[in-house]
Amino acid sequence: YNDPYIEINGAKISLDKINSIFDYEKLDKFANLSKQNNILEIGAGSGRTSQSILTFNNVKYVICDIPPALYISYERLKKVFPDKKIDLVYMEQDKDKLNTKINELDISFIMPDQLNLIRKNFFDLTLAIDCIHEMDKKTVKKFFSDINQLSKIFCFSVWKKCSLPFSNILTKDHVFDYYQNGYEVPSNWTKQFEEELDFPSNFIFCGYKIE
């Protein structure tokens, strides 16, 4: 992908890789990735986190995102994992057919409107890295509602405090303060992990068990 990098002892080091290492360390510390079978990632972006997880763990992986990011991560993972069964299934609206395809594939790419078609509690782990704070609160609430039905545990990393400057211009509904429950985590989720990130230092990583 010709990302900017520096070379150290023959290894190409990029910001993308450094971020992925930090994310992987937190994810594995919370969820023990080797014990997870089915993983859902919300907002995978370029696919850097999914690449790191899939490099070291043989899991079934579903990415839920919107264009153009959906296609970027698709092309990246197709290139990195040529032997895996990977496909875009975002056009499938039949519940049975969608679940069958997900079961047949190693990596599936869907869009948010398909989450309610997936079998209840199918995912051992759901993650959302550096994306929840980019949504308005109505969208976050909808994702959390879907995750509530689909996953056993959920982890995400977000800004400790942020706002969406072009969503009603800094109104209360679009200001997120993690320590004031600004992300409105459902009451049936039990927090089991919380750590501040070393980089970026204004991020927090947390993990929840869904009861």
Identify what each model region corresponds to.
Residues K35-G45:
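Conserved class I S-adenosyl-L-methionine
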Residues S46-N57:
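Conserved SAM-binding loop of SAM-dependent methyltransferases across substrates and taxa
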Residues A128-C131:
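A short beta-strand submotif of the Rossmann-like class I SAM-dependent methyltransferase core
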Residues Y5-E7, A11, L15, A69-I118, ...:
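Class I (Rossmann-like) S-adenosyl-L-methionine-dependent methyltransferase catalytic domain
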Residues N116-T126:
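A short acidic, Gly/Pro-enriched loop at the edge of an enzyme's catalytic core
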Residues E134-I147:
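A short, conserved alpha-helix within the catalytic core of class I
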Residues Y1-S34:
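Conserved Class I S-adenosyl-L-methionine-dependent methyltransferase catalytic core
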